[in-house]
């Protein structure tokens, strides 16, 4: 982030900046700014894309910029054009998951994975868990989840993961052979992931590698 700020992305937080985190949030409309179309009544439960147009910087990420406080603040500003009403009486706690679940759904759709093709999820944070849920909702039969944290692996199992891998004990990639899910290794590709130097691709129908945020 420091490097990004130095080369001109001024909306990105530096380590010296004071900011309030939280880009996954839900809240109620309190009021509107000047020259803003009042499209929803006060007290309406809403979600919004975590982006805020701050002149002259343009759009900055909510919860990752000192110019746009995130969901842990008592009150936040959201972009009216990127805001929408929470539908169907959904509760606020569930609605706050809209952003990570949308990222997960988008990733699974882009992967075009088929139900009989295995999937591997590296990292079981909010987005990784969302990907597992969306994969199982799409009918994918075998989902392998890998994370260093035992708690996250337990959550992955609750979300529907079929195989849990502790990468301290075994590679999630070499585990494919043991599970009988692999053909022959076709090549190794460099994905630049801090803890993995190489990610192997296999001579199977499934050759989709999707990068979601900082997770595969």
Descriptions of predicted regions:
Residues 39-40, 113, 210:
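Short, well-ordered loop/turn sites that connect or cap secondary structure elements
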Residues 7-52, 69, 87-89:
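Glycine-rich beta-strand-centered segment in the early N-terminal region that forms part
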Residues 1-6:
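Cytochrome P450 core scaffold surrounding the K-helix E-X-X-R motif
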Residues 42-43, 116, 213:
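Loop/turn positions that initiate beta-strands
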Residues 128-129:
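N-terminal Rossmann-fold NAD(P) dinucleotide-binding loop
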């Amino acid at each position: 982030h420091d490097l990004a700020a130095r080369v001109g992305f001024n909306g990105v937080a530096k380590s010296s900046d004071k900011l309030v985190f939280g880009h996954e949030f839900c809240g109620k409309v309190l009021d509107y700014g000047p020259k803003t179309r009042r499209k929803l009544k006060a007290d309406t439960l809403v979600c919004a894309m975590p982006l805020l147009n701050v002149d002259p910087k343009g759009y900055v990420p909510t919860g990752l910029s000192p110019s746009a406080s995130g969901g842990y603040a008592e009150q936040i500003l959201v972009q009216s054009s990127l805001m929408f009403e929470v539908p169907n009486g959904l509760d606020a706690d569930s609605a706050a998951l809209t952003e990570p679940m949308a990222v997960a759904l988008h990733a699974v759709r882009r992967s075009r994975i088929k139900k009989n093709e295995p999937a591997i999820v590296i990292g079981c944070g909010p987005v990784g868990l969302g990907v597992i849920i969306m994969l199982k909702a799409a009918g994918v039969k075998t989902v392998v989840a890998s994370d260093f944290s035992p708690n996250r692996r337990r959550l992955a199992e609750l979300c529907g993961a079929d195989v849990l891998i502790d990468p301290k004990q075994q590679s999630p990639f070499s585990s494919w052979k043991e599970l009988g899910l692999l053909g022959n290794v076709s090549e190794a590709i460099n994905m630049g992931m801090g803890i993995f130097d190489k990610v192997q691709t296999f001579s199977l129908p499934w050759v989709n590698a999707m990068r979601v945020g900082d997770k595969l």
